[in-house]
């Protein structure tokens, strides 16, 4: 077992391990096994993650001995993710559709600034990244689960999204939100491994406090995250301030109702000494009433949380819609009048079908139609 994460068991796993799934200490262990000097591990990490390099094959690691490169190629895979489509937006938000090595499709979204996360304008470039292929949690308003759940992403596939977007755009990502396809905390071990690579000085070097995980409400995993050493931020996809409303649109609420979820949140805030964010998608005639706003204010005040209001991004084939701008503003005003720090997300991506999973679903259906 390595400090801060589970070690890869090289003897049990038959398939090749991707080189970008390894922590530096694991690389150092393999380097020793190959009877190479310890500094070779750092050289490999530099080739993988440093901006000027970021090679895509072992052959490109030109300062490593040829025989050593051959051994690495025999021992490890070097997977790539391919960009299938990029959709731009008039507000410069861009959505990326990736094809993985096994043919599965996933999405990421590049957001040039994320005021709703910080409460003010920001020059940061944020990537909204995926953690699973599809989703098993079946939120009624979300496109990610419409085609079901396929598998968890490996650590390297999570990290690769960030590097692929940086490579394509030439822009440095300095903020990551795991709010794309999938339930991040249902892929806990792979995600923690990926975050350690993203956070490490030898990796992508992005500070833990610039990394936010979102969860639909897996109470045990929230408590597990609270006991992790990583100081990442946590956002709760709440979307309903009562069990009645939340249960209509989020099946997870039947397993972990608000009492269980909020108890886990309370444990998290006491352990981490961090402020939570409640993500709240405003859906017309479902969860946008003044009563829901008042009840949400009570919950947020109790936990010292801030609220990020998100007007619903419509999904083809689903009946939901966003409230009027006036209703959105009224909901926000009730929260603020109740003493809750709250923001209403500015329009970013509505014109590029930026709802989670929508581009993947449209592309898959188009391919199925073309081949049927």
Where are these regions (language model features)?
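Glutamine-centric residue-chemistry signal
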Residues: 43, 132, 158-161, 328
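Conserved AdoMet/S-adenosylmethionine-binding subsite of the radical SAM
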Residues: 164-343
């Amino acid at each position: 077992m390595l400090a801060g994460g589970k070690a890869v068991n090289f003897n049990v796993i038959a398939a090749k391990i991707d080189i970008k799934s390894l922590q530096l200490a694991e690389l150092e262990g393999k380097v020793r096994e190959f009877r190479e000097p310890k500094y070779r591990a750092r050289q490999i990490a530099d080739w993988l993650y440093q901006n000027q390099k970021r090679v895509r094959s072992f052959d490109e690691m030109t300062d490593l001995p040829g025989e050593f490169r051959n051994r690495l190629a025999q021992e490890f895979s070097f997977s790539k993710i391919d960009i299938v489509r990029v959709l731009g937006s008039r507000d410069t938000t861009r959505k990326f559709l990736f094809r993985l090595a096994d043919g599965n499709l996933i999405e990421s979204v590049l957001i040039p600034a994320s005021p709703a996360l910080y409460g003010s304008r920001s020059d940061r470039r944020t990537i909204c990244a995926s953690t699973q292929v599809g989703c098993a949690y079946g939120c009624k308003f979300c496109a990610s689960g419409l085609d079901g759940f396929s598998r968890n992403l490996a650590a390297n596939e999570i990290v690769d999204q960030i590097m692929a977007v940086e490579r394509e755009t030439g822009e440095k990502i300095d903020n990551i939100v795991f709010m794309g396809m999938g339930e991040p905390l249902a892929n806990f071990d792979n995600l923690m491994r990926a975050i350690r690579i993203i956070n490490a000085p030898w990796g992508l070097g992005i500070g833990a406090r610039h990394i936010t995980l979102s969860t639909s409400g897996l109470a045990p995993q929230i408590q597990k995250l609270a006991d992790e050493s990583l100081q990442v931020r946590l956002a709760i996809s709440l979307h309903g301030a009562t069990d009645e409303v939340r249960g209509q649109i989020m099946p997870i609420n039947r397993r972990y109702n608000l009492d269980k979820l909020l108890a886990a949140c309370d444990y998290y805030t006491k352990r981490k000494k961090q402020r939570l964010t409640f993500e709240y998608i405003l859906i017309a005639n479902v969860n946008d009433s003044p009563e829901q706003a008042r009840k949400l204010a009570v919950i947020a005040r109790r936990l010292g949380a801030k609220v990020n209001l998100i007007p619903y991004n419509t999904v083809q084939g689903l009946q939901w819609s966003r409230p009027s701008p006036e209703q959105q503003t009224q909901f926000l005003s009730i929260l603020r009048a109740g003493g809750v720090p709250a923001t209403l997300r500015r329009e970013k991506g509505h014109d590029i079908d930026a709802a989670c999973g929508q581009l993947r679903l449209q592309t898959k259906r188009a391919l199925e139609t073309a081949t049927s």
